[in-house]
Regions:
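Long, distal/terminal scaffolding or interaction modules
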Residues: 1-146
Length: 146
């Protein structure tokens, strides 16, 4: 995907393919289905829209860009993010935002629309984490040890 000259890429019927958008820059990627682990890892400025759910480790070590998931995300969402933005309409799993860090003008941002699991923001060294709890019936929309 990084080698293609196409700037706009659309994937239909995605069923767990991993590493989509890894290291990409200046691409517009639209995914229908459920991408696998490490979606947008090491990304450097692309935009990814997922119309479905996403598996674990989306945005792993991401430098820049935006990932929008119009469903739920798995565990370790935004692991070691250094920049960029991740928006998840629904829930995210355990260890969301773990080991996030900001450096100079890079400030990672994760916004979760509903709930997150335990260990949210563990070892965070910068960046912004927001959990809205829009559909949550719990007293607090975050898990334990946050």
């Amino acid at each position: 995907m990084r080698c293609t000259r196409d700037e706009e890429i659309e994937i239909d019927a995605c069923y767990g393919q991993r590493l989509i958008g890894a290291g990409s820059k200046d691409k517009q990627i639209v995914i229908h289905g459920t991408p696998g682990n490490a979606l947008g890892c090491y990304m450097n400025g692309s935009a990814i829209d997922v119309y479905g759910n996403a598996q674990d480790a989306i945005g792993d070590t991401m430098n820049d860009g935006v990932i929008r998931v119009y469903g739920d995300a798995g565990d370790a969402c935004g692991y070691a993010m250094r920049g960029g933005k991740i928006y998840v309409k629904g829930n995210a799993g355990y260890r969301t935002g773990i080991h996030m860090k900001e450096y100079r003008d890079k400030k990672p941002v994760i916004v979760i629309g509903n709930e997150v699991g335990s260990f949210f923001g563990e070892y965070q060294a910068g960046g912004v984490l927001v959990v809205l709890g829009l559909q949550s019936e719990k007293k607090t929309p975050v898990g334990y040890y946050c």
